[in-house]
UniProtKB/Swiss-Prot annotation:
GO biological process: D-tagatose 6-phosphate catabolic process; lactose catabolic process via tagatose-6-phosphate
GO MF, one annotated term: phosphofructokinase activity
Family annotation (InterPro entries): LacC (IPR005926), PfkB_dom (IPR011611), Ribokinase-like (IPR029056), Tagatose/fructose_Pkinase (IPR017583)
Keywords noted in UniProt: ATP-binding, Kinase, Lactose metabolism, Nucleotide-binding, Transferase
Protein name, as recorded: Tagatose-6-phosphate kinase
Record organism: Streptococcus pyogenes serotype M4 (strain MGAS10750)
EC identifiers of the protein: 2.7.1.144
PANTHER family assigned: 1-PHOSPHOFRUCTOKINASE, 1-PHOSPHOFRUCTOKINASE-RELATED
Gene: lacC
Stated family: Belongs to the carbohydrate kinase PfkB family. LacC subfamily.
Coiled-coil regions listed: none
Organism ancestry: Bacteria, Bacillati, Bacillota, Bacilli, Lactobacillales
């Protein structure tokens, strides 16, 4: 069983446009609305892949009800109700670009935060892996992911963390370490205070920084160029083929789903990295965020090259 945690979920609205025109009216014909934010994308892909998954997070208002009502029935919904309204996030797809407008979301009270913490502990009983994805809602301290990871570690659960900014820094500087982190180059550059490129030797050097000590897996997304990964003391480069991209929204979350599945099934390094990248690519071939077409899985799986470097 895999538990996905989405503390600041959203309704994701996608507007495809041939051209985005500023300071005038843009009319959209094809609008897609889905339960969104990173963790909900993760749980949907895990469900498509056939994993047993339950989803939790903080939801409220009619938007929160929309999320529960529009998740597949095969996903176990174990959300914690709050008084504020769940947010809406808009992605405008135009001219090969993606422009996002993201609401901040509700403000949580101390009582609601404590309530979710107890709720989280209860959900761990039958879980092997926990994914923690996305931003923290207003009111939650920067070290809240650190707190949840500590609880999961005490209960013997593997954790996959996909966040950025102060929340990620708090985890890296804290005592409780996740099993996996998945920064991209931009997030890695922010953490280290210097611009990082796809230079493998430079990546090998920085991933051995004491900042990352105690983290079993560091999987750095290189976008269309695949992944650079560190597992304990071993480094890998993952080459992926060129594909036709319909929408890249949620592809990183699909990669997290593959990582979690690999951990839950005790797969070896190459199998885990291959699965993670295939799921990320499959999502990019779909219009719907957080969805994969398993009919294409085997063909893409055979095209991935994982090399120790």
């Amino acid at each position: 069983m895999i538990l996905t945690v989405t503390l600041n979920p959203a309704i994701d609205v996608s507007y495809p446009l041939d051209e985005l025109k500023c300071d005038t009216v843009n009319r959209v014909v094809d609008v897609t609305k889905t339960p969104g934010d990173k963790g909900l994308n993760v749980c949907r892909v895990l469900n498509d892949f056939g994993e047993t998954v339950k989803a939790t997070g903080c939801i409220g208002g009619e938007s929160g009800d929309f999320i529960i009502n529009h998740l597949p029935d095969s996903i176990l919904s174990r959300f914690y109700k709050i008084s504020g309204d769940t947010r809406t996030c808009i992605a405008i797809l135009h001219e090969g670009n993606q422009t996002e407008i993201l609401e901040k979301g509700p403000l949580l009270s101390v009582e609601e935060i404590d309530g979710f913490t107890h709720h989280f502990k209860y959900l761990l009983n039958d879980v092997d892996v926990v994914t923690l994805s996305g931003s923290l809602p207003a009111g939650m301290p920067d070290d809240y992911y650190q707190k949840l990871i500590g609880i999961a570690n005490l209960n013997g659960k593997k954790t996959v963390l996909d966040c950025s900014g102060n929340a990620l820094e708090a985890v890296l500087k804290g005592d409780s370490k996740p099993t996996v982190i998945k920064p991209n180059l931009e997030e890695l550059s922010q953490l280290l205070g210097k611009e990082m490129t796809k230079d493998f030797e430079a990546l090998k050097e920085v991933l051995q920084d004491e900042l990352f000590e105690g983290i079993e897996w560091i999987i750095v997304s290189l976008g269309a160029d695949g992944v650079f990964a560190k597992h304990n003391d071993t480094f890998y480069n993952v080459d992926i083929p060129k594909i036709e991209i319909v929408s890249a929204v949620g592809s990183g979350d699909s990669t997290v789903a593959g990582i979690a599945s690999g951990l839950a099934n005790d797969e070896d390094d190459r199998a885990l990295l291959t699965k993670a990248n295939v799921l990320g690519m499959l999502n990019a071939q779909e219009k719907t965020t957080g969805h994969v077409n398993m009919a294409n899985y085997d063909k893409l799986y055979q095209s991935i090259k994982v090399k120790e470097v």
